[in-house]
């Protein structure tokens, strides 16, 4: 093997390692990302290719009727907007919880469908989708909305 070929190969290996080192923090955000209700919180998917923003606002008790769902407590709602910043985004509506200050969670009624609910349909880059998310609150009133992937909180909106 020629010396110039070996040098080119070594430079390429070092360059690839540097790119991987500097690009990794983009995909490995420190969760949870927190903000105020009404603010857009931005996250990146696990491989760093899709960037999306979620905005959750106006958490309150609701007079909405959820067809086909037997409510055990009081229906609460929030307005959610998902923004496909880079890449197409399929909204993970099922990951939302309304939460009390002392940690009681109320899962989103992700199966609730209606003209004002946020769609779980994929949206293309540069587009956004807005709608209501609903919760069946069976205890103390929530003040926080959290997005949790089943292992950890990703995004948290507080008053």
From Swiss-Prot:
SUPFAM superfamilies reported for this sequence: Antigen MPT63/MPB63 (immunoprotective extracellular protein)
The protein's matches in InterPro entries, at most eight in alphabetical order, are given as: Immunoprotect_excell_Ig-like, MPT63-like
Q: Please list which residues make up the signal peptide.
A: 1-29
Q: Which Pfam families match?
A: DUF1942
A GO cellular component annotated for this chain's UniProt record is: extracellular space
| Chief localisation class | secreted
Asked if Signal is a keyword of the record, the answer is: yes
Keywords linked to the UniProt accession: Secreted, Signal
Give me the segments passing through the membrane: none
Q: Where does the record say this protein resides?
A: Secreted
Q: Does the keyword Cell cycle apply?
A: no
Q: What is this protein called?
A: Immunogenic protein MPT63
User: What species is given as this protein's source?
Assistant: Mycobacterium tuberculosis (strain ATCC 25618 / H37Rv)
């Amino acid at each position: 093997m020629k010396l110039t070929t070996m040098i080119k190969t070594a430079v390429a290996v070092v360059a690839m390692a540097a790119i991987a080192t500097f690009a990794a923090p983009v995909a490995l955000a420190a969760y949870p990302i927190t903000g105020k209700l009404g603010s857009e919180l931005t996250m990146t998917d696990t491989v760093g290719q899709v960037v999306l923003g979620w905005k959750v606002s106006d958490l309150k008790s609701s007079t909405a009727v959820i067809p086909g769902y037997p409510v055990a407590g009081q229906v609460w709602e929030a307005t959610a907007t998902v923004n496909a910043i880079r890449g197409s985004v399929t909204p993970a509506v099922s990951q939302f919880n309304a939460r009390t200050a002392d940690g009681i969670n109320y899962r989103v009624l992700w199966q609730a469908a209606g003209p004002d609910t946020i769609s779980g349909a994929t949206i293309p880059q540069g587009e956004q989708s807005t709608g209501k998310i609903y919760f069946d609150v069976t205890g103390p009133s929530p003040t926080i909305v959290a997005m949790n992937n089943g292992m950890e909180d990703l995004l948290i909106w507080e008053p």
